[in-house]
């Protein structure tokens, strides 16, 4: 049984309006013993007219006192950790290092949402290109990020890009990108970092979590030891999403 959800978002994230109390109460109803709030900081996020989003930023001077308040209020019921999800881009290495040194995060996820100025979520990166090309570019961009940024604990949803491919996972497998993925996993291990098992893949219609189970197995084969589990919930009903399936 998985009793900790290490990836969830609240109203402090640009893409969520969830109240912290509601997320905590949902976790309690689902029998969790620990949660980590990991709201988004994606500095220099590409602007999109349809959303009006210029950046995913968190007011940390409000965030930390608010989390401390809820941590104390629920101290006898559940452990609440103070986390953050950083959107990795190589040029932000210094900014993130300063940020994580300045604020006492309990846990930091490093995720690749932006690939050479584009978030696969919006689809432009796939225009006139095959899924194969974009997936490979994303894995290579992940390596670029790992070479530049070290201010995180685990690498989030490694194959996030597959959610948004034109064919999603129909032409996707670990074997097809083994060279790039192995380099990512070896780099993560050498850095003393971990990877995340993110159950949101199922929520987005994939037949697997992030990363693909073959990648999780390969990570272990290469000597990887750190795997955290997170739902990537942006709403209370998605806390601990499909955790039973992940446990199986």
Describe these PLM feature segments.
Residues 175-240:
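Active-site-adjacent C-terminal substructures of enzyme catalytic domains
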Residues 49, 53-190:
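Extended substrate/RNA-proximal surfaces in nucleic-acid metabolism proteins
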Residues 7, 27, 108, 155-157, ...:
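Conserved, mostly hydrophobic/aromatic
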Residues 39-41, 112, 159, 223:
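Short, small-residue-rich loop/turn micro-motifs
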Residues 33-34, 106, 153, 225:
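Short acidic/polar active-site loop segments enriched in Thr and Asp
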Residues 1-86, 90, 99-102, 164, ...:
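An N-terminally biased module of ancient metal coordination in phosphate/nucleic-acid-related enzymes
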């Amino acid at each position: 049984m998985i009793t900790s959800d290490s990836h969830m978002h609240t109203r402090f994230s640009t893409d969520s309006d969830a109240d912290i109390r509601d997320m905590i109460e949902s976790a309690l109803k689902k029998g969790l013993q620990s949660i980590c709030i990991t709201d988004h900081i994606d500095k220099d996020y590409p602007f999109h007219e349809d959303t009006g989003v210029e950046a995913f930023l968190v007011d940390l001077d409000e965030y930390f006192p608010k989390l401390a308040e809820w941590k104390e209020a629920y101290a006898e019921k559940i452990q609440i950790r103070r986390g953050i999800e950083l959107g990795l881009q190589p040029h932000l290495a210094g900014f993130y290092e300063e940020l994580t040194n300045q604020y006492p995060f309990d846990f930091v996820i490093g995720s690749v949402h932006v690939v050479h100025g584009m978030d696969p979520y919006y689809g432009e990166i796939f225009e006139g290109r095959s899924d194969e090309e974009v997936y490979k570019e994303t894995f290579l961009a992940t390596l670029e990020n790992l070479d530049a940024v070290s201010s995180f604990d685990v690498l989030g949803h490694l194959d996030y890009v597959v959610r948004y491919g034109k064919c999603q996972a129909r032409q996707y497998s670990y074997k097809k990108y083994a060279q790039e993925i192995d380099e990512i996993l070896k780099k993560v291990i050498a850095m003393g970092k971990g990877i995340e098992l993110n159950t949101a893949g199922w929520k987005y219609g994939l037949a697997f979590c992030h990363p693909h189970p073959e990648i999780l197995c390969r990570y272990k084969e290469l000597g990887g030891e750190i795997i955290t589990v997170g739902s990537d919930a942006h709403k209370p009903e998605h806390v601990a999403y499909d955790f039973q399936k992940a446990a199986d």
